[in-house]
């Protein structure tokens, strides 16, 4: 496996998320003929058909009151909730979804901050046994437009569409650990699913990762936060859990890549590069105009910054990439080429 400008495929994202008990975003082209949530649900049922206790819920009219964290069956081990269009959620509904994701997070890293029981609300503590035994995963669908296909569109109209694909608030975006592409044909996914098993993936925390590799990840995070076109006041969009997530993702990739020899279960710089290309694009905050660029305060000409950003947006059209986060992926790739990997 080599790193490139493409996002992770749906099957890999789903299997990794089930093992780590994390939620993820699925990018679906608006021109798809079938309803996106139906495609995602069918793919989940097909990929996880060998797992017991699976419950899938599609929320068409989502968050009118509050999220339901109760399962329909007592034997439910994995509850997957599909949210049709994240970008259409109001601020209030985003807040409810963020609270649901926070309260049902039970990954291997555990909570970063212990709450004071005095301030704990009653609805966060109901049924501890069920919460510990059941994995709650949310798949958020984000629709994007394939702008490459419309060659008759005016150049000015195309540049007006350069807004970010993800418009949800940062505090909700960071609850989803990565983004992936929409499910592909069943015939393709069946071949891929034979490559690795869920039993092997569940042992990912046993994969060896040396301190020098973790320092390499920290170097990548620092360079991404300080990159020329990332939004500095937001730290480039890189969240505090990035180090833990990249470690877990690289461990999973190590198992998948060394499936025939368990003695090779250790993390290498190449796995870190692949994990970075899969993880960071959905988190990065890119400067969209000169008002977001801090260098303007130190002498940069605002019109030159805007001109540079406009030309940067043309790169995606020329590349004909199907990746909705193509510019973000280019930034990550640029950083990876500048940092000397750990030896």
Curated annotation (Swiss-Prot):
Functional note: May be involved in telomere capping.
Family per record: Belongs to the MTC2 family.
Full protein name: Maintenance of telomere capping protein 2
Organism: Vanderwaltozyma polyspora (strain ATCC 22028 / DSM 70294 / BCRC 21397 / CBS 2163 / NBRC 10782 / NRRL Y-8283 / UCD 57-17)
């Amino acid at each position: 496996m080599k790193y490139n400008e493409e996002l992770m495929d749906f099957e890999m994202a789903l299997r990794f998320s089930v093992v780590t008990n994390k939620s993820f975003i699925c990018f679906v082209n608006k021109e798809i003929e079938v309803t996106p949530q139906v495609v995602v649900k069918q793919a989940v049922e097909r990929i996880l058909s060998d797992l017991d206790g699976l419950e899938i819920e599609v929320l068409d009219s989502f968050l009118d009151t509050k999220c339901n964290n109760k399962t329909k069956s007592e034997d439910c081990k994995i509850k997957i909730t599909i949210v049709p269009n994240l970008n259409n959620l109001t601020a209030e509904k985003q807040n409810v979804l963020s609270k649901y994701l926070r309260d049902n997070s039970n990954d291997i890293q555990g909570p970063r901050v212990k709450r004071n029981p005095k301030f704990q609300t009653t609805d966060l503590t109901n049924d501890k046994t069920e919460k510990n035994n059941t994995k709650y995963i949310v798949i958020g669908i984000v629709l994007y437009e394939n702008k490459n296909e419309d060659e008759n569109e005016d150049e000015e109209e195309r540049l007006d569409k350069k807004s970010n694909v993800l418009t949800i608030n940062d505090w909700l975006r960071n609850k989803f650990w990565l983004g992936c592409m929409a499910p592909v044909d069943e015939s393709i996914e069946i071949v891929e699913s034979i490559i690795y098993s869920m039993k092997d993936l569940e042992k990912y925390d046993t994969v060896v990762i040396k301190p020098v590799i973790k320092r390499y990840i920290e170097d990548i995070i620092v360079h991404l936060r300080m990159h020329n076109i990332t939004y500095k006041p937001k730290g480039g969009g890189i969240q505090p859990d990035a180090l833990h997530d990249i470690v877990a993702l690289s461990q999973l990739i190590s198992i998948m890549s060394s499936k025939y020899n368990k003695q090779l279960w250790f993390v290498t710089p190449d796995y870190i590069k692949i994990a970075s290309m899969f993880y960071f694009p959905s988190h990065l905050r890119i400067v969209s105009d000169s008002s977001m660029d801090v260098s303007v305060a130190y002498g940069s000409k605002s019109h030159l910054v805007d001109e540079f950003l406009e030309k940067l947006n043309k790169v995606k059209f020329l590349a004909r990439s199907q990746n909705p986060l193509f510019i973000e992926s280019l930034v990550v790739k640029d950083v990876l080429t500048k940092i000397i990997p750990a030896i």
